[in-house]
């Protein structure tokens, strides 16, 4: 198990708080002991700590299960916020009109989530670590942005 040299925690002053990945049970994604590290990635992103973000994203790029949980978690939250996944998160062409640019890998995974209400583990194991890293990065950036800006995040 890896840790950072300093902790990141949920901020008390944050107006909107989403259930962190470690406390959310997604029916088609197994819960794991390392899920608390996923929380650290969210908090490091919210704190703007690039060193921790980079280290944790590198770790999760090697872990298809962690990326699976992050992407499904982000898709679940975005679905709740927007009443469904907006085209800007699933259609590569639609992202051109937004400041937030989800990765191509995230868009493809989100499109699957939109169609089926979940993604499958095989979709993550079939991807290269670099693709999993970019999908995880997009997922956590999306949730941190929604926490900060709510529905305006995609359209600022």
What are these regions (language model features)?
Residues 1-156:
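C-terminal-biased regions
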